[in-house]
């Protein structure tokens, strides 16, 4: 249920203006009616093909893109903010002379559609297409300048044909492979989850179920082959937020260290290799830990430890990766009975298995150095293992004795010949010693894991391979693509992949030997489809290949990408990997997909929550917002601003806002309320304020229309009045400021503030007191500056005042430096550092002149009371400070 909007009624339209204004200014209803006006102009833009991309243009190309949405069927305010920001940028770049590509598509595969289909007993394709139609209509009402001719939906076979084609490219390039692996299994959705899809509590990001661990044969992509490039090339992304680059760098997780080999006691053939970033602490190792799944565990475990090891491994199998590595959870393990030799000291160390060591991270084995690793000291204390300090520094011993590992630098002790070395130097010294002796190797590792793309569900892109008992894994011939999903099947939502139950679809002939074979029944992670969609937008109607190199050269990289911070790791990292992999396959020339990235903040609204029960209360049920109480219990309610959500009763339906105020008001509010990257707090009063601003502009243009017949300025008169000079100066200051706000760091809220200041200056000057050339220039500039933000009303203004063509096809206004020159300026007068007034002075006045004018001013007479100041501080062009 959506929340309410506009607690107070506005002085909105009553009678609709039924016809378009024309160049000859035919009489019209004098009231701003956004409903009729906006619908009329959108229809005209569509008829004129105003938003169609210029493919053969010699103009520079500019690709503006919003992260495409999942078609839930319901547009929310987060969508509105995302798409309106991108639309403003696209419209400005068109007016600046670029050929702009501004497309839209649908990230349409995935579990929500399949689950909805199960709940409603409807085909997910039918449900998805219906939602797409509904959301397209909702987006259209916002007045977005989208080229709908390039629309793509990832669930349509003419799109996922090419997702399959690209998968085969990766398979041929050795970047796609299968392996048995421990995977995160969602017992509710019955599918495998990537690590990134499991939250910090070990729950599925979608169903909320506690995730289990299972061994399955899965498809992976070798994103780790690109770990170094993905990390290093973050430095190229100067147009990305530092926060996103840091998040990706941390996720990739580069670590420098050494692999050290520990020989198994009593065996000349068996050894355990560990990776450590702290070879300087090797003398302090008191045990070695293996992952419970490590291949050596069975062979190393002694007979008396078999039962406890087996029981512990079963216990760990029920834990998710997130749970096992959580800092909050106690570390648990059992001994195997085996020992290894510390290669540096010769000491015998016991071998344990523990839940915090993962088989697929590093070597699946770690050395335990309790004195210098917090996780290790907790484990050692819990299991009575030795704690040996090997780095000395002020406060180190005391910290270790108190149970806190010393992880800072210091001086090596208890390390034999390395005693006395700085610990940072000891890292290299001990590694070099080990390399010479043959038990150590310098190594760089990454936290990044290969990308698991297998999903055991129906509504996804089929993986285009066939399993033949004779030939093995056989790619589907490219001429046979797409491998289409069977439609109209029964979806129980349980028991692994629904595709495996479709015998007519599964059973096929092997393309190599002709024998009986079976299709792959896993589908791809939906991020496969969204990791290359921006490339398809460059060449959407190509039936021979997913995109041509020429089209990609024309449009890519995306000049401005807009989307939520929640995609910092998943979508953005995968897209960067795809781009580099396809470059190496010779399909494209670019290294990075997105030149500039803007991560817009969330749209929040007020919530009322009972802190005792945790229950949210609908706004309509709160009788007194100033003293909010739970209507059932009488408890005092918490008042918060939180992300809009139906479950919190604080959602605002965009359609309701547009119905009441019009799309231009909705756009202006969403852009003005907060800087794009900050969270936005919904406020009905501020929506009303933007509507009133557009009404004031309406009245300004109405008044001017009786004076002007067109917007073709005949040039600026030489003999400007002070009032006219002020208007010209305000105009060109606004052009300069708004243009600056749309370059570099996009600041749309301050740009709108400049429009308000300019309109106030024109209005207060009185259009009837300005000569036509000045009024023409001022309104032409104002309307063109307004056009990207409020496109419908700006088009109406342009038409009413006799502008040629569409305002959206006009040039972006440029600054006339001569208009900014001032004969006189305002100089602040301070007395003892406090502002007491101001004077008007010649713009080129020197210090002596300004001092004289200040001393003889009424301000000085009032505050100095005839006394002579001891000191006068003059800052030319700004202020005079009188110090009595």
Swiss-Prot record:
Gene Ontology biological-process entries: leucyl-tRNA aminoacylation
Family matches, as SUPFAM superfamilies: Anticodon-binding domain of a subclass of class I aminoacyl-tRNA synthetases, Nucleotidylyl transferase, ValRS/IleRS/LeuRS editing domain
Biased composition (Low complexity): 15-26
Annotated binding of ATP, by residue: 646
Parts forming coiled coils: none
Cellular component, GO, one term: cytosol
Classification via Pfam families: Anticodon_1, tRNA-synt_1, tRNA-synt_1_2, tRNA-synt_1g
Region feature Disordered, mapped onto this chain: 1-37
Main localization, broad class: cytoplasm
Subcellular location, record wording: Cytoplasm
EC number: 6.1.1.4
Residues spanned by motif 'KMSKS' region: 643-647
Keywords: Aminoacyl-tRNA synthetase, ATP-binding, Cytoplasm, Ligase, Nucleotide-binding, Protein biosynthesis
Family: Belongs to the class-I aminoacyl-tRNA synthetase family.
Protein's name according to its UniProt entry: Leucine--tRNA ligase
Organism: Synechococcus sp. (strain CC9902)
Gene: leuS
